């Protein structure tokens, strides 16, 4: 459903996306035990990860999905991915990480997934509302990750889970 021209504006699912999907699929028994009713994907790009999870989780319960991306094109493509895959109970928000959302989500999110921009780049690139923001991780590829991490514990409910894809250069 995504036109090849749109991939010039959003993060095209790549090896890291498919690795993340494989890892999440292996976790599905645990994820179903968590019984997430609110799934948050930060930086969805095309929306394939939250669409995939919603379908897997839906077998055991209904799940509402919120996707947040700084890139408006990614928001539009994610919404279309949800619609074309019949992903129910979704909302797509254009925002820089959790700006303006953290207080409303406090202690409400059951599951967070984030395939962050982790490529080491100049710091300024991490704030661009365009395709560059999809890979620009700043110094050591950690700046975007480090801006988000302080908010995670406040938005996760007790027993909630956070899945974050990292790579060696990020010094996890």
Q: Which residues make up each language-model segment?
A:
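Class I SAM-dependent transferase core
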Residues: 1-31
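Residue-level signal for pocket-adjacent positions within structured domains
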Residues: 5-6, 92, 126, 130
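Glycine- and other small-residue-rich loops at beta-strand/loop junctions that grip anionic moieties
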Residues: 9, 42, 137, 141
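Conserved Class I SAM-dependent methyltransferase catalytic core
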Residues: 9, 15, 20-22, 142-172
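Glycine-centered small-residue hotspots that permit tight backbone geometry or close packing
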Residues: 17, 74, 137-141
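Conserved SAM/SAH cofactor-binding pocket of Class I
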Residues: 21-125
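Active-site-adjacent beta-strand anchor residues
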Residues: 68, 138, 165
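Mobile active-site "lid"/loop adjacent to the S-adenosyl-L-methionine
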Residues: 116-144
